[in-house]
Amino acid sequence: MSYDLLIRGCRIIDGESAPAYRADVGIQDGIISAIGPLPDAEAERVLDCPELILSPGFIDIHTHTDFTILINPRAESKIRQGVTTEVIGNCGSSAAPLCGEKLVRVREQNKDLVIDWKTLGEYCERVNIQGTAVNLIPLTGHGNIRSSVMGYDPRPPGREEMNRMLELLRQSLEEGSRGISTGLVYPPGVFSGSDELVELLSEVSRFGGIYSTHMRNESDRVEEAVEEAINLAEKAGVSLQISHLKAQGRRNWHRIESCFRKIEAARSRGMDIHCDRYPYIASATDLDILLPSWTWEGGSEEELRRLSEPTIRKRIRDEITKDDWESVIISRVATEKNRKLEGRNLKDIAADRRLEPVDCLFDILMEEELEVEALFFGMSRDNLERILKKPYCMIASDASAQADYGLLSRGKPHPRTFGTFPRVLGKLVRRGVLPLEAAVYKMTGMPAEKLGLKDRGVIREGAAADLVIFNQAKVK
């Protein structure tokens, strides 16, 4: 038999939690055609891999590559980690649908791109015309739907608005979306209530999709947030994915045990519920996450106006209780004049400016017109390992595809951008936190099952040949 590619003598981890075994693999037309001893096989290309491991390509179930893939379709920060499939559209924000205020805001935030689509179908056509190094599985951002219909108003939708939101969601699901995501700490998701969300989730359930949620709280009220996520999904009868499970802040580390109990109780009732996590103890998001949610009402222009008014600044200052400003590190700014702030913490920046850290926060947000990203330390390493060990936890980067050159090399991104999967396979597996087969399953077969992918995430005859070869002793 002749193949396009023959991989000889590799140690196979099949993505289904089975023990590793040694075999040859023959690949033809992008499909795994044969697995086993193939001593007489020929191929256009032969790889002899007796010291290496062959696994399914990794499925990154929580990413933000929606727009960066159009800047650089090579997705190098993902491909170099072994990622072959990404789930985009997380945390309530996706590339589509884009209407009304959402379209205006996305164009403002992505000046390096021509945003010439409005629907998911049009976005997918744009990506396919350009090409992409990774498979992309889209979710529909609840924030897109809500802001497309009713902007950033802090109120429940009226019946006509709700119907329009359902129409936009239904169209996206018909055009290939695998479900919906929420970002309930971000505008406009923070303004949404349970009735609105259950109605949308019920529509997703009818399509057999999933609900991925950046919960309403990940610190002082994380237990309530887990309960809310479970209740919403249970009422709607939809599969639940809790994004980047954590208990942020030392005073909340003990709360993770209660979160586990709630998740496991729901699973024991038959709920399809999982979570994901990156292998680091710092998170990353927009700097204005530190502001009270009412400052976001009405959109970015209103937020900047509030920051410019002394009396409102005082009110905001009085509501911010943060004191560990050294744990907040600026990772990316928009202007050249503040580039020197990247990689530095707010406490030190404030000292240089002879300001209180909270006033320094306000000034930086205004100088950058809110376009500031930051890293936030405050998670427990012990909790991290306990989360990753859970049989319902997958590995995810929570990062967009980046590069070390060009437009995507700006700033000092979270190391998860380039290091999530190697860190698990190298550091955590070698330390015995996870067995190798279990770690690979969390990156391959488990997310494939969650997403209903039949031909990805596994090594079996007839499956797509999205594969990764790595040296377990050296991966880092």
What is the role of each PLM region?
Residues 91-98, 106-235:
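Hydrophobic, small-residue-rich alpha-helical packing segments that form membrane-like cores
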Residues 12-24, 372-378, 383-384, 432-440, ...:
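Acidic, glycine-enriched loop/beta-strand segments at the rims
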Residues 41, 49-115, 219:
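Metal-associated gating/positioning segment near the N- to mid-region
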